[in-house]
Amino acid sequence: MDNVTCARILSDASLEILPLLDAAYQVRKHYFGQEVRVHILNNAQNGHCQEDCHYCAQAKSSTAEIEEYGMKSDEEMLQEARTAYNKGASCYCMVYAGRQASQARIDRLKRILAQIKVEFPDKEICVSTGFVTNQGAVELKQAGLDRLNHNLNTSESHYPNICTTHTFADRLNTLLAAKSAGLKVCSGMIVGMGEGYADIIDVAKRLRVLKAESIPVNLLVPIEGNVLSPQESNMSPDFILRILCLFRFLNPSSEIRVAAGRELHLRSMEVMALYPANSLFLQGYLNAKGSSNARTLRMIKDAGFSIKSELDLDELLKEQAPQQDLVSDGSKALLKGLKELRPAIQTK
């Protein structure tokens, strides 16, 4: 698909959204049927990051009031893995703050991975831990890691506008290291950081070349204290759905995830994202709250979709406790407290 056609999908109002969604859905259905893959994030180490990624509440450039803590214990990580899989997740994602995975962290991860795989040998594990060397990627693969996450976030030309402490090439090299080690790759972008059509198209095509197995499409979450705020003129539900369709057309067999910010930016059109996308997060994001598990699972069921799990969706819905479903105060995202960030331990 040439860039002119891609730009038309994003911008041409004469290409109505419903036919586009149907076309993307036919591709999605061919590869994934009616199945939705649920991922649950574990913010395994929060804050204290020396990178200045302008979109991130953990960055040194952010004044967001997050709950900071060091690496969670092995037992805490294992208990939260159990909880994630018992809530219907097909993939458990451990996310660590910081620039690069040290050898000490690699060794710690290898131990945690081995423990999780003993209990859940058939479940996917994804890790996001900054830059990873070729050797580090090989060691993680041998320890049982299925997938490494490292988002490109935006195009190479736009990258200096969102971060100055590392480069686009640094991120790309980590993805290449993961691929060379035989790991699956999870990499996507963040929409709403001042990028243009060309930047969106560039990321979608770059991920196609990389053969990224999983592609999260994040929508910039408005967190008080962060350098960047969403470019609202470019964040209509219609435009977001067009982006998801484009990613599906260019990456037909990849898992496309409607990721952070779906509740805030898609609003009443949120369920429509499941027609081009086949994956989402349950239980919120790294520091920002998401919709309740009950609401998300109900949305999946009501639209006629199923989840990739041996657990029954109806039974999961019955188990959900009533929760307040509030993700923002009207202008800024609500942040998680320790009760949500560290559910496996008792907090005072």
Sequence positions of predicted segments:
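Auxiliary Fe-S-binding modules of radical SAM enzymes
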Residues: 1-15, 208-348
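Hydrophobic faces of well-ordered beta-strands that scaffold small-molecule active sites
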Residues: 36-41, 92-94, 125-127, 148-150, ...
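Active-site phosphate/pyrophosphate- and oxyanion-stabilizing loops and adjacent acidic/basic residues
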Residues: 25-26, 114, 245, 271
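Terminal or standalone catalytic/regulatory effector modules within metabolic enzymes
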Residues: 1-30, 35
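N-terminal pre-triad scaffold of radical SAM enzymes
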Residues: 21-62, 69-93
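Conserved strand-to-helix beginnings and helix N-cap segments that scaffold or border functional pockets
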Residues: 21, 50, 106-109, 197-201, ...
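Conserved Radical SAM active-site core
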Residues: 2, 60-188, 192-193, 197-199, ...
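N-terminal cationic-hydrophobic initiation segments that often serve targeting/anchoring roles
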Residues: 10, 28-29, 85, 117, ...
